[in-house]
Amino acid sequence: MANTVYENFFLSNIVEDQFNSHLDLLPFCTVDNTLEGVAGMKRVINTYRATDGTEKLTVGEGNSKSIEVNYTPVEYVIALAQNRFEWFDEDAMKDPMLVPVGLKHGATDMYNTVQGDIYGEFAKTGLVVNATTPDFDAFVDASGALNLENIEDVKVFAFVCPKDKAKVRKALKDDLKYVEEYAKHGYIGTVAGINVYAKQDATEGEIVVATKEAVTIFTKKGVSTEQITEGNRSEDAANKRKNTAFSRKYYVVALTDESKAVKIKLTA
């Protein structure tokens, strides 16, 4: 498909926001740079789960069950995410905005793809806390469902979609505190030791609560780029004055510890 360029008249250039979400999820997961292999190769990753074991007892009673931890080997395929942007010399001469916008969107599109996979792994968790409203008790129950030995030493976070953000603020009121230490793009506040962030493309009606141990991204390196432009084009591309830019990333994203992620499911 050919690029759309503007004709030769005065134009105010407005570049639309192309990010699905500005909240970067890499700080919220474990990054492992030891990935080996090529696209299509399989990697087996153990996903850990823990069963509940808390019981309310009377005098003389003991627990009838214990917390049990087990794992399931899950097979993942190494992904190669790649995008391509093509333009002709004449396009750039006619519209100076075309190439910068196209190259920038190559990076943005890659970012959206990887970020979507990371959030998708968090959302796979089978631990669910049902709540009619996202109030203080709902977040406390979610925190309690996580397999945490010492919550004081662990950073717990939550992702909420913009449509549910107002519900969270309304339900929590003064229980939602603003802590400067955790302030970053999308930060709403902290409740029950959980830092709550708004994520533009999070699922409505579901609030993911987790620690960074829940999801791991296995990667070789960052995004690599390749440009085929004047001076290194093939004879055919040079003859047509055609340029091409590629962005690539090899990675696997996995829910490596399901006991470290829980969803608050709003049932109202």
Question: Whereabouts are the PLM-identified features?
Answer:
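N-terminal "assembly arms/tails" that initiate or stabilize quaternary assembly
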Residues: M1-T72
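Short acidic, glycine/tyrosine-flanked loop/strand segments centered on an H-E-D-like triad
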Residues: V69-M93
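Alpha-helical scaffold segments that mediate packing/assembly in large oligomeric complexes
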Residues: E86-D153, K263-A268
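Structural beta-strand/beta-sheet cores of well-ordered domains, especially the beta-sheet scaffolds
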Residues: M41-R43, N83, V154-V156, A192-I194, ...
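Short helix/loop capping segments that flank catalytic or ligand/cofactor-binding pockets
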Residues: G53-K56, D95, K167-K170, A254-T256
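Extended, compositionally biased alpha-helical segments that mediate assembly or anchoring
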Residues: R233-A268
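Extended oligomerization regions of viral-like shell subunits
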Residues: V140, L146-Q227
